[in-house]
């Protein structure tokens, strides 16, 4: 074999060597990348399971002594659990048998007087200082609007314990009839509800009344349509 042919064989072997080794290197890099990805994914999954308590040792839910929750949610839950449930409340309904007047009853179905709230002389009495929701609804009914057009009023008044003066806290005026009623128009039945409600800072001993100027138009066909009440907040 000549020297030139030997040199040519060595050069051919050197050119063939990278072609043979190249695919093995590519497969090795691909395997390392896959292994790294699986390792990172497994570590992430393990961290999430430990973080959310899916795996790991079970701990008692009771907090150790001297440990306090300071998060807003914990404070809200703690204050709610300590909030007193004995708040005054009153809900009374109108007496359907009272002719020509609005008289409130507390001993009927769906009425309530609790935690000091009282009904005295047709008035609700506040048992303690605090913030209260005061509300009332009247339902009126009639037949036709001619010749006289009724003007309905609904008023909730307060008699303060500090000064015996009647003050209107809530009031409304409504007319169930149109401004102009043509002569000879058919007398059709009408219904007109008036609801009043508001939140007030009240004192112990304050008294409330709910009144109307035309009690003869009150609708007592169904129970619970005419009511009056207060709720401590």
Swiss-Prot record:
Alphabetized GO MF terms: cytokine activity; tumor necrosis factor receptor binding
Homology family: Belongs to the tumor necrosis factor family.
Quaternary organization: Homotrimer. Interacts with SPPL2B.
PANTHER family listed in its UniProt record: TUMOR NECROSIS FACTOR, TUMOR NECROSIS FACTOR FAMILY MEMBER
Positions on the Extracellular side per record topology: 56-233
Species of the source: Dasypus novemcinctus (Nine-banded armadillo)
Taxonomic superkingdom: Eukaryota
Residues marked Cleavage (site): 33-34, 38-39, 48-51, 77-78
Protein name per UniProt: Tumor necrosis factor
Primary localization: membrane
Disulfide bonds: 145-177
A cellular component annotation (GO) from this entry: extracellular space
Residues of the THD domain: 88-233
Keywords for the protein's UniProt record, in alphabetical order: Cell membrane, Cytokine, Disulfide bond, Glycoprotein, Lipoprotein, Membrane, Myristate, Phosphoprotein, Secreted, Signal-anchor, Transmembrane, Transmembrane helix
Its job: Cytokine that binds to TNFRSF1A/TNFR1 and TNFRSF1B/TNFBR. It is mainly secreted by macrophages and can induce cell death of certain tumor cell lines. It is potent pyrogen causing fever by direct action or by stimulation of interleukin-1 secretion and is implicated in the induction of cachexia, Under certain conditions it can stimulate cell proliferation and induce cell differentiation. Induces insulin resistance in adipocytes via inhibition of insulin-induced IRS1 tyrosine phosphorylation and insulin-induced glucose uptake. The TNF intracellular domain (ICD) form induces IL12 production in dendritic cells.
CDD domains from the UniProt entry: TNF
InterPro entries registered for this protein in UniProt: TNF, TNF_alpha, TNF_CS, TNF_dom, Tumour_necrosis_fac-like_dom
Post-translational events: The soluble form derives from the membrane form by proteolytic processing. The membrane-bound form is further proteolytically processed by SPPL2A or SPPL2B through regulated intramembrane proteolysis producing TNF intracellular domains (ICD1 and ICD2) released in the cytosol and TNF C-domain 1 and C-domain 2 secreted into the extracellular space. The membrane form, but not the soluble form, is phosphorylated on serine residues. Dephosphorylation of the membrane form occurs by binding to soluble TNFRSF1A/TNFR1.
Cytoplasmic-facing ranges: 1-34
Positions where Phosphoserine occurs in the chain: 2
Compartment(s) of residence: Cell membrane
Gene Ontology BP term (one): positive regulation of protein-containing complex disassembly
Lipidation (N6-myristoyl lysine): 19-20
